[in-house]
UniProtKB/Swiss-Prot annotation:
Key words, A-Z: Disulfide bond, Secreted, Toxin
GO molecular function, one term: toxin activity
UniProt source species: Dendroaspis viridis
Family according to the record: Belongs to the three-finger toxin family. Short-chain subfamily. Orphan group XI sub-subfamily.
Subcellular location: Secreted
Entry annotated with the keyword Ribosomal protein: no
Keyword Disulfide bond: yes
InterPro entries, A to Z: Snake_3FTx, Snake_toxin-like_sf, Snake_toxin_con_site, Toxin_cobra-type
Protein's UniProt name: Toxin 4.9.6
Amino acid sequence: MICYSHKTPQNSATITCEEKTCYKFVTKLPGVILARGCGCPKKEIFRKSIHCCRSDKCNE
């Protein structure tokens, strides 16, 4: 699986992951992404802010 690893959509760096999911951690501000990467973090406190998917496309 290949996931994006940068915080902004303009950066196109990717990483290769063993996991079959990617995630992005977003804020309440539109378009602001704090982190992207492999897997799907399960922290309950951040759950509504973390979007996980089985494709790098939803990590854009």
